[in-house]
Amino acid sequence: MEVSSTVDDLTPGEIRRAIAGFPHAEGYSLRVIPLRYRGDKPHLSAWTDFDQRSITIQIPQPFLPFGEVVPYGAQRRPGKGMRFIWLTEGVTFRTHREVLRFLYLHEWMHWFLKERKGTKSQAETTCDRFALRNYKKRTVTMQDAREALRRRRETTVG
């Protein structure tokens, strides 16, 4: 996979080492660019361009540790209509490496759903669940991706 970076303190080699052990988005390039956030806190930002066959990850600059609430599922509530509550987990990203790993896995799952499963790729909760369960693991497999397609009652981090 072709890897490029315009983030000053993150080289393509460091990016490759950070995602070593993760599945590759075959035929796609990976770009890492700065996110110059406005306001008082950084946030997560990445996208997959299926026409250009690329994954772009934005790393907050300057980098400061930050928290994000990650939705990993929804639970139906009794009553009339389609009522539900989001199941979420708070995550603190302490390093740009953690942000890179989380966002890469999230975007890889979009790639997997479209390119390998042939389904719609707009499954944000599934992609978040996959990234949340796996971004701290040394090795991530296709089996991990298949497990993320089935929501469990609890999420496993680490």
What is each stretch, according to the model?
Residues M1-A74, G79-F93:
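A metal-dependent hydrolase signature that marks the N-terminal structural subdomain at the beginning
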Residues W86-E107:
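Alpha-helix-centered segments that form part of catalytic cores
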Residues F102-E115, C127:
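Active-site recognition of the HExxH zinc-binding catalytic motif
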Residues E14-G21, Y104, T126, F130-N134:
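Amphipathic alpha-helical segments that form well-ordered structural scaffolds
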Residues L64-G67, W111-L113, K120-S121:
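Short catalytic/ligand-binding loop motif for oxyanion handling, primarily in non-cytosolic enzymes
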Residues K120-R152:
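Post-HExxH zinc-binding segment in Zn-dependent metallohydrolases
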Residues T11, R101, A123:
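Hydrophobic (often cysteine-bearing) scaffold residues that line and stabilize catalytic clefts
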